[in-house]
Amino acid sequence: MRIDQSIINEIKDKTDILDLVSEYVKLEKRGRNYIGLCPFHDEKTPSFTVSEDKQICHCFGCKKGGNVFQFTQEIKDISFVEAVKELGDRVNVAVDIEATQFNSNVQIASDDLQMIEMHELIQEFYYYALTKTVEGEQALTYLQERGFTDALIKERGIGFAPDSSHFCHDFLQKKGYDIELAYEAGLLSRNEENFSYYDRFRNRIMFPLKNAQGRIVGYSGRTYTGQEPKYLNSPETPIFQKRKLLYNLDKARKSIRKLDEIVLLEGFMDVIKSDTAGLKNVVATMGTQLSDEHITFIRKLTLNITLMFDGDFAGSEATLKTGQHLLQQGLNVFVIQLPSGMDPDEYIGKYGNDAFTAFVKNDKKSFAHYKVSILKDEIAHNDLSYERYLKELSHDISLMKSSILQQKALNDVAPFFNVSPEQLANEIQFNQAPANYYPDDEYGGYDEYGGYIEPEPIGMAQFDNLSRQEKAERAFLKHLMRDKDTFLNYYESVDKDNFTNQHFKYVFEVLHDFYAENDQYNISDAVQYVNSNELRETLISLEQYNLNDEPYENEIDDYVNVINEKGQETIESLNHKLREATRIGDVELQKYYLQQIVAKNKERM
């Protein structure tokens, strides 16, 4: 069934595309529009634009974009109906589930969506088992003793998997789900001898793991009785891939954008406690190193990343390794060094929330400053290490994109080598590494001097090298996009088959369909009438094409005449063929060509 158009319009009107896109892309204002790195493909310079006035977005690289619905479809790989429902939930507009082809029999087309639905349904039962059953009391007490309030447990969706081999299995089976699919989703395990299925998580506190869109895609089950392993995580599945997921990103995205900084912690428990303490831009990996996929996504939100790992040797080693890699990828890297032997949870437990947030705010160092402070003893007592680390730190500072931050780092690092900031700066110039010093730097965006490379002017490929007739077609369509009256006055004046540019021909047809249902042209509404990225790009490019506000006298008529020249050329060709048929005396051909000429002339009248 079709969704009522009034519902679609209400959702679209209540959803601001700038706010929506900003949750996924770090945008900078450029003139009247906003620009950022495209979320749909990897690129070195920004080519993804958002128009707040027109409520559309468009990538001039991969051609993807559109209005709020099409952006949501692309970013989440879902259908139009699902996008409408999701955005409706976002702005509190009810969408009739039955009328939009959703049903309660879990007959969802995508296996991935079924896997997500399984996780979200079982979460409700895990939560119930934790908070409402006798079996969950011990686990609940364990959490409460560690500072988890009832409100926090509910907010995070924390639950309890009973000590039963078929709690999850039986629940999903009763709901009509494919047990094999539940196994592939990581909720069940399988006995490889008899191929029987049983619950993967038993007698554990269950922490839901969500993707960037806030959908549950996995679990981390924590023991509260001392059993091993301490944490049992979901296995790699089609919906749960650790290299692509950052814990808490769905909640932290807005704060990351607002603060222009992301804080990376070691584990999700640290994230929960830090978030509760007031640090809202925190995320963590799922027990893995920061991957290239993680970095690519982070760069689209911010270029500033702060590392706050545990205050032990392993945490220090991880900070040095991760920070070095991030610096090489063009990010501004900072470090918060926790007291020895402490993690964020322990710091908060000992000193309180206010002390923790103050510590985070006031004890932040550049990566270069942190690195040299860790290596200071070796630098002071080993001349070979002195030379080695002098070159390393010089290069690290040279990678910093801000000249102000570079100068601050020079001032902080120079005393550790007993040199002046000026001498260290000279060392940087002397040992300046070539652009390909780090061959794995795939992100680009900066020249060999650390300067930001401005994006090249955006060109509209389909508007390059247009013929005289195509230019007339473009201007004609632009005027038709101005208002419905103009369209109605001139629609019958042109035969669509006379368009030489096929994209323009399709736009002409789209305008007909659009004005059949709308009285006023709006690009955000119009893009809903096209299905291909190429045609969508043409429509958006026409919208951005500048033409005089009001047509001069007979201007549109002139464009019509030029477009119809194609039809005139056809008549001239028919006249030529008629003369040739007359010359050779073929009466039948003469009659045929004469009929064609008469028909063509009638079309023009």
Curated annotation (Swiss-Prot):
Residue sites binding Mg(2+) 2 per the record: D310, D312
SUPFAM superfamilies reported in the protein's UniProt record: DNA primase core, N-terminal domain of DnaB helicase, Zinc beta-ribbon
Catalytic activity: ssDNA + n NTP = ssDNA/pppN(pN)n-1 hybrid + (n-1) diphosphate
Any one Gene Ontology molecular-function term assigned to this protein's record: zinc ion binding
Cellular component GO terms held in the UniProt record: cytoplasm; DNA-directed RNA polymerase complex; primosome complex
Cofactor(s) needed for function: Zn(2+); Mg(2+)
SMART domains per the UniProt record, alphabetical: TOPRIM, ZnF_CHCC
Function: RNA polymerase that catalyzes the synthesis of short RNA molecules used as primers for DNA polymerase during DNA replication.
Family: Belongs to the DnaG primase family.
Protein name per UniProt: DNA primase
Organism: Staphylococcus aureus (strain MW2)
